[in-house]
Amino acid sequence: MAQRLKTFYLNSVVPKLRQQFHHRNIHEVPSIKKIVINRGLGDASQNAKLLDGSLQELTTIAGQRGVITRSKQAIAAFKIRQDMPVGISVTLRGERMYAFLDRLINLALPRIRDFQGMSTKSFDGQGNYSLGLNEQLMFPEINYDAIDQMRGMDISIITSATEDREGFALLQALGMPFRTATID
């Protein structure tokens, strides 16, 4: 079964963007390639219980098991040895990607306290968008009583757009709530 956001993208967003940017071929229209959710563990890397809890939370939020990222080299100042767990990463593609983006836009972001909209300055120059979240409680899948510590996450939305203007138009057409109607 196709996701609601994917169906909306194919039926409404593609024709709109094709007309807006004068694309001759439908394959020129920007699309979302993948979404990467990353969480740095910080002091939780010392404690296996916190690592497992964080991995379980990210798995619940993303709907897919995450990969534990490990340090490449030892850094004495941070008390990190080589191959020590330092973060968790989940890469979403296909149906799960659209399901997560739909939940992010329609459920999680509106639950942020004093939410004013997303910044347009987080584009990387190639149409990809990154955002950071301070806490995991905005996702309805997370039980407030089950969490041990507030931890944020970084979310990167990688698109096939070649410039920020196209990436902004794609995300705005999909319903991403931005502060301003134009890109800076």
UniProtKB/Swiss-Prot annotation:
Alphabetically list the UniProt keywords.
Chloroplast, Plastid, Ribonucleoprotein, Ribosomal protein, RNA-binding, rRNA-binding
Q: From the Swiss-Prot or TrEMBL record, what is one GO molecular function term?
A: structural constituent of ribosome
Q: Which domain of life is it from?
A: Eukaryota
Q: Which cellular compartments is it found in?
A: Plastid, Chloroplast
Query: InterPro entries from the entry?
Result: Ribosomal_uL5, Ribosomal_uL5_bac-type, Ribosomal_uL5_C, Ribosomal_uL5_CS, Ribosomal_uL5_dom_sf, Ribosomal_uL5_N
Q: Which GO terms describe its biological process?
A: translation
TM segment ranges: none
Q: Which residues form a coiled coil?
A: none
Task: Report whether RNA-binding shows up as a keyword of the record.
Answer: yes
Is Glycoprotein found in the keyword set? no
Q: Which GO terms describe its cellular component?
A: chloroplast; ribonucleoprotein complex; ribosome
> How would you summarize the oligomeric state and partners of this protein?
Part of the 50S ribosomal subunit; contacts the 5S rRNA.
Q: What does this protein do?
A: Binds 5S rRNA, forms part of the central protuberance of the 50S subunit.
Tell me which family the UniProt entry assigns to this protein. Answer: Belongs to the universal ribosomal protein uL5 family.
NCBIfam families in the record: PRK00010.1
User: By what name is this protein known?
Assistant: Large ribosomal subunit protein uL5c
The organism is Nephroselmis olivacea
